């Protein structure tokens, strides 16, 4: 029943966003708007993804690996794996867990510009206990952060509710809805944050490497209609 209600909540938000019409600024690139559910990670290798690490001399294969149908990231050195393509107007789904200890990580959406640590993007936080927070990076902006208030701490916009994460070692689910200049995030089906009037409306999607061992699975993108 809880899983069913979570799906209903996400569907309701998507339906509302589809009724919102706003102007979308482009940068000359043609982002992909998904027409069907697409697995972004094929479960076998990193086809369709590019790895970037702060230490250019580091071996990416020692940071990112595939085992037992999972993506495993050591968290060191800092960096990310990102999609080769840009995307717009989608629901992004990823599942993650901390197999050893609690740590820091995140999903970057609307990533653009040069590969660096950290690139222009909006981070949807995965830091233990804080999944659902937003962080603005390298000039990107959302209205909720720009206006300030009790939820804003530096570049961070704190999530709306208490943590909805599962205990350490268990799998969590992130659903990130991007529609025009809105970004809406659900953690295990619980609505945790809403960003509006985002300065960027498309870009690449990144999974961070940021200090602790983390595992990912079931990474896909879906259309909003």
Predicted feature residues:
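Bacterial N-terminal signal peptides
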Residues: 9-19
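Carbohydrate-interacting regions of secretory-pathway proteins
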Residues: 23-225
């Amino acid at each position: 029943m809880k899983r069913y209600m979570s799906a209903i909540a996400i569907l309701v938000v998507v339906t509302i966003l589809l009724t919102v019409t706003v102007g979308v600024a482009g940068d000359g690139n043609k982002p992909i708007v998904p027409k069907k559910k697409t697995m972004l990670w094929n479960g076998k290798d990193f086809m369709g993804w590019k790895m970037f690490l702060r230490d250019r001399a580091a071996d990416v294969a020692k940071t990112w690996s595939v085992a037992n149908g999972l993506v495993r990231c050591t968290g060191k050195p800092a960096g990310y794996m990102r999609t080769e393509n840009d995307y717009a107007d989608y629901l992004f789904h990823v599942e993650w867990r901390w197999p050893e200890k609690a740590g820091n990580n995140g999903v970057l959406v609307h990533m653009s510009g040069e590969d660096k640590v950290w690139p222009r993007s909006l981070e949807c936080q995965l830091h233990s206990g804080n999944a659902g927070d937003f962080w603005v990076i390298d000039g990107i902006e959302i209205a909720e952060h720009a206006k300030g208030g009790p939820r804003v701490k530096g570049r961070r916009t704190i999530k709306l509710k208490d943590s909805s994460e599962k205990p350490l070692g268990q799998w969590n689910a992130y659903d990130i809805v991007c529609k025009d200049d809105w970004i809406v995030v659900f953690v295990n089906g619980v609505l945790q944050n809403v960003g509006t009037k985002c300065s960027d409306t498309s870009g690449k999607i990144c999974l961070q490497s940021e200090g602790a061992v983390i595992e990912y699975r079931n990474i896909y993108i879906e259309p909003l209609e």
